[in-house]
Amino acid sequence: MRLAIDLGGTNIRIAQVAEGKCLKRNSVACLATQDVDVILTQLFELIEPMIGETVEGIGIGVPSIVDTVHGIVYDAMNIASWKEVHLKELLEEKFGLPVAVNNDSNCFALGESLFGSGRLYENMVGITIGTGIGLGIIIHHSLYGGGYAGAGELGALPYLEADYEYYCSSGFFKRRNTTGAAESEKALKGDNDALLLWQEF
């Protein structure tokens, strides 16, 4: 069994995973505006109750470019204090388990390729839309991460008057004083304003 963690600017999610199945999960709102140590403490406290004798390792996806060999996180999107965090080293010292760190969109694409609908395809991309926007690339059933795991970091690409992330992430809804979840619920009930907002998105 392994622990799978998704560290995002909005939430930190964790799950116990074995043979492609999620056994137990938990999540907390990420204190993304706080210092590095505050967020690390959050992460440690989320991991501790999930650790058991059968846990063999930890995998964590982060919204940033990553030195995947050393597990160093650089300039995490929407987590301003995470400029250079030696996450692999910190987690391995704390829990005594092997740790793998990669870009969150890469983790998503690889998971879909191995266990999801991507299994049917030799080549695919997985697009993640949340606090930010990212993309993972699978070529011949293998992850193509590029330099610092950033091959699919399309959010910062210029688009219209800003970049893709400005228009195609949760910021789109935040600037309208709402959330994607709230507007999704309204749209499913046939709310015309919500439907128009999603059409614009």
Map each language-model feature to its residues.
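Glycine-rich phosphate-binding loop and adjoining helix at the ATP-binding site
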Residues: 32-44, 48, 54-58, 64-123
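Short glycine-rich anion-binding loops that position phosphate/pyrophosphate groups of nucleotides
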Residues: 10, 63-65, 130-132
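Residue-level signal for inorganic ion chemistry
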Residues: 14, 28, 60, 173
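N-terminal beta1-alpha1 ligand-phosphate binding loop
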Residues: 2-17
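Short hydrophobic alpha-helix segments
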Residues: 26-28, 77, 147
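Hydrophobic "anchor" residues
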Residues: 22, 73, 143-144
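Short glycine-aspartate micro-motif
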Residues: 2-6, 57-59, 124-128, 134
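Glycine/GP-enriched mid-protein hinge/lid loop-to-helix segment characteristic of carbohydrate kinases
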Residues: 15-18, 34-38, 100, 115-201
